[in-house]
Amino acid sequence: MAENPIYGPFFGVMGAASAIIFSALGAAYGTAKSGTGIAAMSVMRPELIMKSIIPVVMAGIIAIYGLVVAVLIAGSLDAPSNNYTLYKGFIHLGAGLAVGFSGLAAGFAIGIVGDAGVRGTAQQPRLFVGMILILIFAEVLGLYGLIVAIYLYTKQ
């Protein structure tokens, strides 16, 4: 019982919660920030709305990363009496924090780049390719967190 304390699953639940909460916060910020840029740009150039929706889609993908890890963690949560160790709880917490905080950072980056990018693309269409490349690098930050989280999750 010493290696399976009653508070072990608490850390696993916190890992699942932090995975979805922080990545959803990043996705929401990215969507809101780039969405305001799209709204401001579409007043003058409404034909560019569909082309400018890419940052919003990329921000939404960040939340999916957190959802995947949260579901994985929630699926392996169990009672301490069923061999859910404190080690598993800490691993799940680390995995959730890894994907959550990297998703938060990626969402912030996508939002800021997406806002400035769609406004700039409306005035100079050649900026579109550069905006997409920067958005890809911002999205990869969230993907790195997903990779680390899945790697940690498999260590149980």
Curated annotation (Swiss-Prot):
Q: Does the keyword Nucleus apply?
A: no
What is the membrane topology noted in the UniProt record heading this document?
Multi-pass membrane protein
Q: Where are the transmembrane segments?
A: 8-30, 53-73, 93-114, 127-152
The GO terms this record gives for MF are: proton-transporting ATPase activity, rotational mechanism
Pfam families xrefs: ATP-synt_C
State where it is primarily located. membrane
Q: Cytoplasmic side: which ranges?
A: 31-52, 115-126
Per UniProt, the keywords (alphabetical) are: Hydrogen ion transport, Ion transport, Membrane, Transmembrane, Transmembrane helix, Transport
Tell me the residue ranges located in the Lumenal compartment per UniProt.
1-7, 74-92, 153-156
Task: Determine if Phosphoprotein is one of this entry's keywords.
Answer: no
- Choose one Gene Ontology CC annotation of this protein and give it: proton-transporting V-type ATPase, V0 domain
Subcellular locations according to the entry: Membrane
Q: Which Gene3D superfamilies does the UniProt record give?
A: lithium bound rotor ring of v- atpase
- Site-annotated residues for Essential for proton translocation: 139
The record's function comment reads: Proton-conducting pore forming subunit of the V0 complex of vacuolar(H+)-ATPase (V-ATPase), a multisubunit enzyme composed of a peripheral complex (V1) that hydrolyzes ATP and a membrane integral complex (V0) that translocates protons. V-ATPase is responsible for acidifying and maintaining the pH of intracellular compartments and in some cell types, is targeted to the plasma membrane, where it is responsible for acidifying the extracellular environment.
- Kindly state the subunit structure of this protein: V-ATPase is a heteromultimeric enzyme made up of two complexes: the ATP-hydrolytic V1 complex and the proton translocation V0 complex. The V1 complex consists of three catalytic AB heterodimers that form a heterohexamer, three peripheral stalks each consisting of EG heterodimers, one central rotor including subunits D and F, and the regulatory subunits C and H. The proton translocation complex V0 consists of the proton transport subunit a, a ring of proteolipid subunits c9c'', rotary subunit d, subunits e and f, and the accessory subunits VhaAC45 and ATP6AP2.
Q: Which family does it belong to?
A: Belongs to the V-ATPase proteolipid subunit family.
- Can you name this protein? V-type proton ATPase 16 kDa proteolipid subunit c
